[in-house]
Amino acid sequence: MDILQDLESRGLIHQTTDRERLEKHLQNNQVTLYCGFDPTADSLHIGHLVPLTMLKRFQQAGHKPIALVGGGTGMIGDPSGRSSERSLNAPEVVHGFTSKLQQQIAKLVDMESNASENTVVARNNHDWLGNMTIIDFLRDAGKHFGINYMLAKESVSARIEQGITFTEFSYMILQSLDYLKLYEEENCTLQIGGSDQWGNITAGMELIRRSRENLDENIEVFGLTVPLITKADGTKFGKTAGNAIWLDASKTSPYEFYQFWFNTDDRDVIRFIRYFTFLSVEEITELEKEVETQPEKRVAQKRLAEEMTKTVHDEAALEQAKRITNALFSGDIKQLNVEEVEQAFKDVPNHIITREPVGLIDLLVDAKISSSKRQAREDVKNGAIYINGERVQDMNYHVEEKDHLGNKFTVVRRGKKKYFLIQVESIS
C-alpha cells in the first residue's frame, strides 16, 4: 500500500491537487514536503497532532518532511477559519513561542533520533520573512497576486462582511513565499495542512509557477489537506470542559491527556485510532470488533489513550497516568506520590489547613465539603466521607499528620465522585 492509499484508508485526505499526478510523483521520487505551524501559544495542542503525524507517515514512507515554524507569519496571524482578527503578540513573545514549538516538534517527530537522509528538517520562516523589505515584498511577491484572485479565497471572502485588515489580507502572500522559498532551497514540492489551508496552499503553488515561469524547468508542485476533526456528539474536538488539551505536560498533565483519549465516544474511537496512531489495519480491525461486541470494556479507548500518551509524552508518563487512573478506580489513593496527587486532583476544590490536628466535622464545613455541621454529621454517619480512599464513620475523627500524603495533601471524597484536595500548610 503506497502512502496516499494508506492515508485514504485512514480517512486522512480531504483534498489534493491533481491526485493522479501526485500519486505518480510520490511513487517515482523521494519527495520533500512541508507543513507549517504558527506560534500562537507556548505549546502545540492536540489539533496539531494530525499534521505532525502526517509528517511522520511521509517520513516512514521514505520521503523528506520539513516542519516549518512560523516565526515570521506568527507575527501577523492567519485569518483562515476565524471570524475576527487575532490580537498581535509582541515580537519577543512570538520568538519565545517559536522556540518552544521547535523543541516540541523535535521531540514529537524524532528529529534528533538519527542522521538518515530523510530525517525531519526544522525551519523557521522568520529567517527569510524577517529580513524582507516592503519593496521586495511588493515587487517580488505582490505583483503575482491579483486582488480578485485573493478575494475569491475562502479565508478572505469569509471575512469581507465583518472586515479584514491589510495585515491579515497579506497573510496568504507570506505563506506563499514560504512554499516558494522551500521549493527553491529544498526542492520542496508538496505542502500539507488542515482543510482551512487550501486557499493558502494553492496560492503558494501559483506563486511558484508565476515567479519561475520564464525559467526552463518542469514545475511540479502539489497540495494536500487533512479533514477537520469532528466529534459524533457535535462538541468541538480538542477541548474538555472548555479547556484546550495541550501537548506540554505543564499545561495538560499526562493523566489529563490520557483521560481525554480514554473518554472518547464509542462512535469516534476507531476513527481517531486511524487518524492519530500508527496501528496496522489488522490491529484496528480487531479493536473495531471489540467496540461492536464489548463496548463496556473500552478496549479501543484504552489502546488509543496508551498510544497517544506514549507518543506525546513517554512510557514513564503513560505508566504514571495509568497508575493514577487505577488508584481513582479502586479508591486506593495512598499508593500515589505527591506529583501524582497533584495531577489527579488539579481541578478539584481545595482548602488549606495548618499542621495541627483538625476535627473531621469542622474540616468538612470549613472546606465547604458539607453545607453545615448537621449535614457533616449525617455524611459521616451515612458512610459518605472518605479520607485518602478509606471510609471514615467516626464523628470524633481528627485529620492529622498520618493522613497527610507526602506530608502535603489529604484527599477527601464525598459520595462516589466528589473529590476535595486538602493542602497542608508548608513549613516556613
Curated annotation (Swiss-Prot):
GO terms for MF: ATP binding; RNA binding; tyrosine-tRNA ligase activity
Leading EC class: ligase
InterPro entries noted in UniProt: aa-tRNA-synth_I_CS, aa-tRNA-synth_Ic, Rossmann-like_a/b/a_fold, S4_RNA-bd, S4_RNA-bd_sf, SYY-like_C, Tyr-tRNA-ligase, Tyr-tRNA-ligase_bac-type
Residue stretches making up the S4 RNA-binding domain: 358-424
Transmembrane segments: none
Subcellular location: Cytoplasm
Cytoplasm listed as a keyword: yes
GO aspect biological process, one term: tyrosyl-tRNA aminoacylation
Short motif 'HIGH' region, span: 39-48
A Pfam family it matches: tRNA-synt_1b
GO cellular component, one term: cytosol
Entries under Gene3D superfamilies matching the protein: HUPs, RNA-binding S4 domain, Tyrosyl-Transfer RNA Synthetase
Chain positions of motif 'KMSKS' region: 236-240
Keywords: Aminoacyl-tRNA synthetase, ATP-binding, Cytoplasm, Ligase, Nucleotide-binding, Protein biosynthesis, RNA-binding
EC number(s) stated in the UniProt entry for this protein: 6.1.1.1
Residues where L-tyrosine binds: 34, 171, 175
Binding annotation for ATP: 239
Catalyzed reaction equations: tRNA(Tyr) + L-tyrosine + ATP = L-tyrosyl-tRNA(Tyr) + AMP + diphosphate + H(+)
Assembly behavior: Homodimer.
Family membership: Belongs to the class-I aminoacyl-tRNA synthetase family. TyrS type 1 subfamily.
Role noted for this protein: Catalyzes the attachment of tyrosine to tRNA(Tyr) in a two-step reaction: tyrosine is first activated by ATP to form Tyr-AMP and then transferred to the acceptor end of tRNA(Tyr).
Protein name, per record: Tyrosine--tRNA ligase
